Amino acid sequence: MMGVVLGEGKLPFWIQKEVELKSSVKKGARGMAARRVQEWLQFHGFGLVIDEDFGGVTKKMVQQFQEARGLGTSGMVNAATFQELVAPLLQVLTPISAANHTFSTMVLEYAKAHLAQHPLEVGGQNRGPWVRVYMKGHDGAEFPWCAGFVTFILKQAAETLGMTMPIQGSTSCDSLAAQGKEAGLFMKESTLNGENASIDHLSRASIFFVRRSSTDWTHTGLATAFHRDAFETIEGNTNDEGSREGYEVCSRSRGYNKKDFILL
């Protein structure tokens, strides 16, 4: 397997489950092994119902995927087929050179790497392999994953540079904001207002929060570039409409209204 960043060369157990095939999966298989195959088939555009039952339809989709990738069309998911299915995830786990990078620029490079693979939910709200990777093995409606995505990127950047993260990280927006305050890195929207306000000291990459109240934030992501009236983002669990319950990692432009930041 290609090199990875997290876990000092060894993948955390919840990621191992997503990218390591213990035995071939074929027609008749049930449960998570079948589900993962179905999820990745759907991710790659081979649509089918995700029901954790490897039946005739799943076998047919596997054969179509194998044919498209120049593999033998057995309809059985062996190691070679599985590696092709999970290739986008393996790609984002591949270390990026740390040369000439600060922490904030390293964060930006990893965020771009994830964006290029277009992670998205598969099989329902907050479901699928990408969500489980960002959320330490959890998925489902009760696991919004925007903060998990941010934390995962920060961990990759910190481990690549051999440094401690500026904040601990969390799967909760409110916890991330609290950590930023405790570290003295939190910047309120109010500091951007007024005649003497400036955005020039914002880092190339920072964490942004969508604020509902002074103690409640509903969404978070990475701010990647700043302009006078708007900033650019890479964020998870959102969509082109900017919903806090979206379905993908995407890049957006946002205004500063009701936004706070953690400086990186």
Where is each model-derived feature located?
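Residue-level detector of conserved, well-ordered beta-strand and adjacent loop positions
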Residues: E8-F13, K26, V86, K112, ...
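Terminal peptide-recognition signature
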Residues: V62, C146, V150, A205
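N-terminal capping segments
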Residues: G3-E8, P12-E20, F82-M165
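Solvent-exposed, acidic/flexible segments
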Residues: K27-A34, D51, G55, K59, ...
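Low-complexity, Gly/Ser/Thr/Pro-rich intrinsically disordered linker/tail segments
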Residues: G246-L264
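...with weaker cross-activation on analogous glycine-rich loops/strands in unrelated enzymes
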Residues: V57, H101, T105, T160-S243
